[in-house]
Structures are given as C-alpha cells and as structure tokens.
Amino acid sequence: MSAITPTRERILYAAAELFRRQGYAGTGLNQIVAEAQAPFGSLYHHFPGGKQQLAEDVIRAGGAFFQHLVTAIYDAEPNAEASIRAVFTTAAETLTATDFQDACPIATIALDVASTNDHLRRATAEVFEEWTTALTERLDDSDHALAILAALEGAFVICRAQRTTRPMHAAGEMAAALVTR
C-alpha cells in the first residue's frame, strides 16, 4: 500500500489481510494499526464500533472483491466446465504462492465467529448467499451453485490443514464434472 493511501483504507486492508491469515480472534487491534501504519485512535475514528465494525466492513468489502475476482475468472472461460476448473486452479495457485496462508477471507472469519458472534455470522452468511446467487446466474441451477461453493470453501480448509493443494484439485474436478451433466 502506498504512503498516500487514506488511513481508513490502510486499516481496512491490513485487517483484511490479517483476518484472512490469522482469523478474527487471532488478530488484535494493535496488530492491525501497526500493520496499517496508523495511529491507534484513527481506528476508532474510522470504525467507531471497533473490531466488530471493522470486521463487518472487511467482510462486505472482501465479499464484493472476491465475487468480482471469481466472476472475472469464470467469465473469461469458454464454458462452465472450464470456468469452474479455472476458479479452483486459481485458488490452488494462490494457496501455493502464499504458503497456504491466504484462503477465503469470508470463510476464515465465518469459521472463527459462527457460534460466538451472530452479527458477523449473519454478515458472512449474506456474502455466501450473494456468491451463490452470482454463480446460480451463470449455471441456472442453485443446488449446483451451492455445492460448488461448498466444495471450494471446504477445499480451502482441508488444503490449509494438510498443506497440499490436492483437495482443491479434487474438488475442482468434482465441481467441473457436476456442471457437465
């Protein structure tokens, strides 16, 4: 990030990166402002609701960003099967390039807060619903869209735990086969 990037955006970006890698509970406010190179007071100036408001903004901004990214990858391919493979291949490449640290930021937060913070759980659920809707528009089958999203998110979790992209590739092949039926 550039030194001229506004403070709010630096804080949002730093929080998104840290939440994606460490989870919500594993990330402290001091760490966020240090990473953002921002004064501590600026966090509460821009996010008066504190860490929860910051996380909700990260969820919504991250959800929109990743939906745009995935749909761009998907739409660049000639057919649904190739599109699905490209999404899963890109996810595997990202995991490898980041030493399995970068996965889906929404899933990372959802897994962390689903049973302890209903406000953030609802925000993550809304993003997953938006993603399912976007994929349904491309596949014309909401069950297939949901199954593919579930396979992708589950593969992220298993890949990180096992430190291999094999689950992502296997899930991608299964998802691609689903759309060719």
PLM region descriptions:
Residues M1-P6:
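N-terminal intrinsically disordered/low-complexity leader segments
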Residues A55, A82-A86, A97-R122:
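Amphipathic alpha-helical segments used for helix-helix packing
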Residues I59-F65:
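Short, basic, alpha-helical segments at the C-terminal edge of helix-turn-helix-like DNA-binding modules
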Residues A25, P78, L139-S142:
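Short, charged helix-capping/linker segments at alpha-helix termini
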Residues R10, A14-Q53, D57:
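Helix-turn-helix
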